[in-house]
Each structure stands twice: as structure tokens, then as C-alpha cells.
């Protein structure tokens, strides 16, 4: 079994799960990973250390872990001194997790809360304390919806560090105009800055997936450059969906129905300093926000518009 040493401020060492123990636990539970739930469990201690180190969490953090599975990442997060709320949709795994933690370090169990829930329905009033960070090996099938839901539902979250399918990682971190740039790229930047932090080999998981994973970190803007209320966010996201739903069209043509006419669409775009001949796939989150707010200035929205400062690109190095 692998182990990880705590910082000098605490002498406790928590044993991490290795491949042998993960298989033993699965056999004990008569558990077979379900592809429909994206159940691939990380068993490599170095990978777990890397994820936790990238997250930067400490004993002052309340970490929300999505899909803890058999507990590999959970143990490492507890070893950093953090409080962890683990959200697990599988009832068998949710029931077993506290016992696994107790077997590895009984004194840490008091800092663990397990919720047998679908993360997409999780609400802030279900948690005793607001989470400050998300650290997770996200199931491939819900990665983007889960990220957007958590960032919107929990404004207290300052950082998000997740392993996702490599293709999803590329899309999240893509820049305007790139072939991978799309709806997830824009929407996640409504909340913060995004950076890819490297690749993760399929061989560190059980069962071994067919694709590589990517490590991604999102840092929420310390002060949001624009309003963050749900109504404003929905209006911005509506524009994003319109633009990428017709990504081969010019912005002028894509926004005709939204603006009411081609001329009005062009006028709104020009008011936002956007060339109507551009395509939606070249617009940044700043452009979409500015388009909505300038439209409000023209009477095209029920919100008074103000020009946001730029959100900037990139994020702190991983």
C-alpha cells in the first residue's frame, strides 16, 4: 500500500489506497464498476499526491469531493487537514467510504461527511458549511454539467481542481478561435480563470479507461468583473448557446432572432465593439457579457448595462 507523509505541522500519516487494496475492496463489496456512472478509480499514489498538491488545499478548507468512489483521493485530502464533504451517487460506495477512512486513520473520520446524492441536484442549504474548494476525479459523463452547477450554486468555492477526460480538459481550457473552443470554454470563464495542469495516464485507474485524462484547475475571480446573479448568468449563457448553436454563421445572422432583425443584431454587436461579420466561436466571455450589457443600454434587455473590466486570460501556473 502507498502512503503519504503529512507536513511537519502534523505527524499523522494516512495510508493511501493502492491497486491491490482497491481490488480487494471491490471484491469485498461484490462491486463491479458501472460504465454508465463513469466509475474509474485512481490507484496511483503519485497521481493522487499531484492532484492534491495542485489544488493547494489546507486545513482551513472545506473541500467538496465529487464521486469519491472507494476513497483514494478522499484519504489524501483528509491528510492535508481539510474538512471533506464527499458526494457519491452510488449507495454501496457511499456507505463503505466512512469505514475505509476509519480503517486508514480513525481520528480523521470526524472531518468527513458523506452524502449519497446526485451532485447535479446538490443545493447549498444541504451543507453545514460553505465549501471553499472542489477536488475530484469527475465522472466523464457529468464533468461539465457538474462543474457549472457547483460554480453557480456555491459562490464560496474559490478553486476547482479536477481530473476529467483529456478532450474535456482541452475544451475547458481552449482559447477563442481554437478548434476545441466551445460552450464549456466560455461558460466556465464566466466564473473564473482556467488552466490545464497536465495529462494523466489511463494506467493509473481501475478499470483502465480507453482515453487519457487531463488535470484542470479553475480559480474563481477574486472580484467578479460582472454581475453574478442567476438572471444575468442565464442571459449571458443564452447568448453563448445561440452563438455556438450556429457556429458557422456570422454573429449578425446568428443573433437575428434574439435581436429581432438583422439590422438590430448588427447594431447591438457594433455597440459592443464586435464586428458583425465575426463568428461566435471567436467571441470571449468578455464579448458575450459586453453584448448583453450594451443591448441593455439600447433598451434590448431589462437590465441596465455597465461595461465590465476584462476578465483576462489564463490562470496562475499549476
Curated annotation (Swiss-Prot):
Protein location: Cytoplasm
Record's GO cellular component terms: cytosol
EC number: 2.1.1.182
GO molecular function per UniProt: 16S rRNA (adenine(1518)-N(6)/adenine(1519)-N(6))-dimethyltransferase activity; RNA binding
SMART domains per UniProt: rADc
Function: Specifically dimethylates two adjacent adenosines (A1518 and A1519) in the loop of a conserved hairpin near the 3'-end of 16S rRNA in the 30S particle. May play a critical role in biogenesis of 30S subunits.
Name listed for the protein in its UniProt record: Ribosomal RNA small subunit methyltransferase A
Species of provenance: Mycobacterium avium (strain 104)
Amino acid at each position: 500500500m502507498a502512503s503519504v507523509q503529512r507536513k511537519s505541522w502534523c505527524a499523522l500519516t494516512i495510508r493511501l489506497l493502492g491497486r491491490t487494496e482497491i481490488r480487494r475492496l471491490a471484491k469485498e463489496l461484490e462491486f463491479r464498476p458501472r460504465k454508465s456512472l463513469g466509475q474509474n478509480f485512481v490507484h496511483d499514489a503519485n497521481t493522487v499526491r499531484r492532484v492534491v498538491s495542485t489544488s493547494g488545499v489546507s486545513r482551513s478548507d472545506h473541500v467538496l469531493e465529487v464521486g469519491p468512489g472507494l476513497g483514494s483521493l478522499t484519504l489524501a485530502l483528509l491528510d492535508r487537514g481539510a474538512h471533506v464533504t464527499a458526494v457519491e451517487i452510488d449507495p454501496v460506495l457511499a456507505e463503505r467510504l466512512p469505514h475505509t477512512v476509519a480503517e486508514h486513520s480513525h481520528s480523521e473520520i470526524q472531518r468527513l461527511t458523506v452524502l449519497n446524492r446526485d451532485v447535479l441536484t446538490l443545493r447549498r442549504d444541504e451543507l453545514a458549511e460553505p465549501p471553499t474548494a472542489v477536488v475530484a476525479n469527475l465522472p466523464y459523463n457529468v464533468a461539465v454539467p457538474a462543474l457549472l452547477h457547483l460554480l453557480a450554486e456555491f459562490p464560496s468555492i474559490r478553486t476547482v481542481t479536477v481530473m476529467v477526460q483529456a478532450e474535456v480538459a482541452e475544451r475547458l481550457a481552449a482559447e477563442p478561435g481554437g478548434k476545441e473552443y466551445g460552450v464549456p470554454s466560455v461558460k466556465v470563464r464566466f466564473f473564473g480563470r482556467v488552466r490545464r495542469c497536465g495529462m494523466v495516464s489511463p494506467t493509473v485507474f481501475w478499470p483502465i479507461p480507453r482515453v487519457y485524462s487531463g488535470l484542470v484547475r479553475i480559480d474563481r475571480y477574486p472580484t467578479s468583473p460582472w454581475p453574478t446573479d442567476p438572471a444575468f448568468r442565464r442571459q449571458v449563457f443564452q447568448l453563448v448557446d445561440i452563438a455556438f448553436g450556429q457556429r458557422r454563421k456570422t454573429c449578425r445572422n446568428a443573433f437575428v432572432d434574439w435581436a429581432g432583425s438583422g439590422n438590430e443584431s448588427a447594431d447591438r454587436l457594433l455597440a459592443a465593439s464586435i464586428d458583425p461579420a465575426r463568428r461566435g466561436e471567436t467571441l470571449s466571455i468578455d464579448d458575450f457579457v459586453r453584448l448583453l450589457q450594451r443591448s441593455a443600454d439600447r433598451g434590448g434587455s431589462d437590465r441596465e448595462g455597465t461595461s465590465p473590466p476584462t476578465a483576462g486570460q489564463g490562470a496562475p501556473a499549476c
